[in-house]
């Protein structure tokens, strides 16, 4: 239904029928960003009242943004996700709903419905649904709480007693700060897999801190401001973790109320961190709290920050520059030659971030892209992930990628058998 030929708006419908009874399962229900070529569907192909389960692979808006619409239209089934995604769900959707034109009363009603319908589940355990369908969640390593999903359907034939489908959701890169690496997938008949970076191999991630350090040293020498558009969920926390490691004497401002709220939740969910982050935290080196880090919560403080002189680092949303406080900062600083803008995440077609990277908008500030900060697996990582399946799937469907990415990854997967 969504993200078939683009990167945003993920939504998949699975229909199963046995003994005259049908089960409708939705996997993700996301919003579309920018000018992604795929026109978002205006109506769900089955009545939301008839959808039994909604699985959420993680809490990014391009995977959950239409959940309020689904409930508005009558959905009352179970929302299934990991425990960490459950904790992140309402803060992310509250922010999205606040910009949707809904009144406070409507938002409060929807939040209560979402909270009542959603359930957090453990990873690596098998749970049962209707009609003897089962599911198991695995760590996807994309952001905190992200998972890929194995759905197993009864299939009483001579060839097999079951049919297994995996939805990858968004797969993370290996060696991502804070997060454990993605799990290897089990055997399946059908694999529905993301392909965001199916045409690209990331630079060596071990060198990215040095790349960031070099750019920040330049800003320090130029006395300029470094603007980093960053997603509130995932990327901001990753940046704070590495800025703490770099330990430069430059003030760092997080100018995003949502990112600050999400960072507080990340801190409370330390049991889901990777080994390195846990060890640092146990030694008293909290990755999201260091000298020179400042939180900008109120709009008044945001307006004051617009007047700051460098050197300084400002992290603000939205990550694709489609809205949020980053727009005020860019308006203020794009035409100042000593300033820098660092993009550390995917920029969808038609977004301001993509247009800046491609040079469509003339600016005096320097534009940089650190693709090694992507929270998505690159081409080789995706291939290796598929190759780690004990037995190759009978079918692979690539989604969540632009045309070039899907075509190139298809070719590579065919070459690798």
Locate the predicted segments by residue.
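Core dinuclear metal-dependent hydrolase active-site scaffold
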Residues: 1-49, 120-180, 302-313, 325, ...
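Active-site metal-binding loops of divalent metal-dependent hydrolases
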Residues: 3-4, 29-32, 84, 143, ...
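Pre-active-site segment of Zn-dependent metallo-hydrolases
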Residues: 4-6, 13-77, 81-116, 173-181, ...
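Divalent metal-coordination and catalytic microenvironments
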Residues: 28, 58-59, 89, 142, ...
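Acidic/glycine-enriched edge-of-secondary-structure segments
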Residues: 29-30, 52, 162-168, 172-174, ...
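Metallo-beta-lactamase
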Residues: 90-146, 271-309
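Cap/insert and terminal regions of metallo-dependent hydrolase folds
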Residues: 174-255, 340-345, 355-416
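Hard-cation-handling environments
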Residues: 213-344, 349-352
């Amino acid at each position: 239904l969504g993200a078939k030929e683009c990167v945003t708006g993920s939504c998949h419908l699975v229909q199963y029928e046995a003994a005259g009874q049908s089960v409708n399962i939705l996997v993700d229900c996301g919003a579309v960003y920018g000018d992604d070529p795929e026109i978002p569907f205006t109506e769900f192909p089955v009545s939301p009242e008839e959808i039994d389960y909604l699985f959420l692979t993680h809490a990014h808006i391009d995977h959950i943004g239409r959940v309020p619409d689904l409930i508005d239209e009558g959905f009352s089934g179970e929302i299934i996700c990991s425990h960490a995604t459950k904790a992140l769900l309402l803060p992310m959707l509250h922010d999205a709903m606040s910009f949707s034109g809904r009144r406070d009363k409507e938002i409060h009603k929807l939040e209560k419905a979402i909270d009542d319908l959603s359930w957090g589940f453990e990873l690596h355990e098998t749970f049962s649904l209707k009609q003897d369908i089962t599911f198991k969640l695995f760590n996807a390593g994309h952001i905190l709480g992200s998972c890929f999903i194995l759905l197993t359907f009864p299939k009483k034939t001579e060839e097999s007693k079951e049919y297994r489908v995996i939805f990858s959701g968004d797969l993370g890169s290996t060696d991502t700060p804070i997060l454990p690496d993605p799990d290897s997938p089990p055997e399946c008949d059908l694999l529905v897999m993301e392909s965001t970076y199916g045409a690209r191999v990331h630079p060596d991630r071990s060198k990215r801190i040095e790349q960031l350090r070099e750019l920040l040293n330049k800003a320090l020498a130029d006395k300029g401001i470094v603007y980093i558009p960053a997603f509130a969920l995932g990327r901001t926390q990753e940046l704070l973790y590495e800025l703490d490691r770099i330990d430069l004497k430059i003030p760092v401002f997080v100018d995003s109320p949502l990112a600050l709220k999400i960072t507080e939740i990340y801190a409370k969910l330390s049991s889901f961190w990777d080994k390195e982050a846990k060890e640092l935290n146990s030694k008293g080196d909290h990755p999201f709290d260091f000298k020179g880090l400042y939180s900008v919560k109120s709009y008044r403080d945001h307006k004051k920050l617009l007047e700051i002189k460098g050197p300084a680092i400002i992290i603000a949303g939205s990550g694709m520059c489609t809205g949020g406080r980053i727009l005020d900062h860019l308006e203020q600083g794009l035409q100042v030659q000593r300033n820098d803008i660092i993009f550390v995440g995917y920029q969808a077609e038609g977004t301001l971030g993509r247009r800046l990277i491609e040079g469509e908008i003339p600016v005096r500030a320097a534009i940089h892209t650190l693709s090694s900060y992507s929270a998505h697996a690159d081409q080789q990582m995706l291939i290796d992930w598929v190759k780690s399946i004990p037995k190759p799937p009978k079918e692979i469907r690539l989604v969540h990628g632009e045309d070039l990415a899907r075509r190139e990854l298809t070719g590579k997967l065919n070459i690798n058998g």
